[in-house]
Amino acid sequence: MKINIIIVDKKGKDQLYAPLIEHYKKIAKPFAKVEVIELFDKEIAKAHDISPEAAQKSYTKAMEKYLSGAFNVALDPSSKELDSHQFAKLLKDRGVVNFYIGGAYGFESGFLTKCNQAVSFGKITLSHKLMKVVLLEQVFRGLSINHNHPYHK
């Protein structure tokens, strides 16, 4: 199984969260290969200066090339919240799962409709770097549930 976390975020290791990110990728390894793909380019930076709508379009353009051949899940605060067992079902029996974390302005509705599902981690706002860690923990928890690993107990 392959799990990709595709995020609008500047590339590079964050000294605070990088050890946690690597920790969750490592402990998930018996169940899945987990990769974090950070997307941020001049086009996204320029779009941020134009308007929220332009920014959303730039996120879609950067992310849509990852949509084919995977089960695609967008993180969207206005979507349905899942408990850990429901989240685990998203991962069950899938070859490739892509999770998308949008930029500061979220996703345009057209991108959300291209995804198989959109889920919410609640209405609070988290930094992108922290959301990466929270998502990785839930990915490992979901994999643990699916493989009867004691982590979730």
Regions found by a protein language model. Name each.
Residues K33-V96:
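S-adenosyl-L-methionine/SAH cofactor-binding core of RNA-modifying enzymes
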Residues K2-I6, E35-I37, N98:
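A structural signal for isolated positions on well-ordered beta-strands in alpha/beta enzyme cores
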Residues S109-K153:
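Structured adenosyl-cofactor binding patch, chiefly the S-adenosyl-L-methionine
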Residues M1-A28:
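N-terminal beta1-alpha1 ligand-phosphate binding loop
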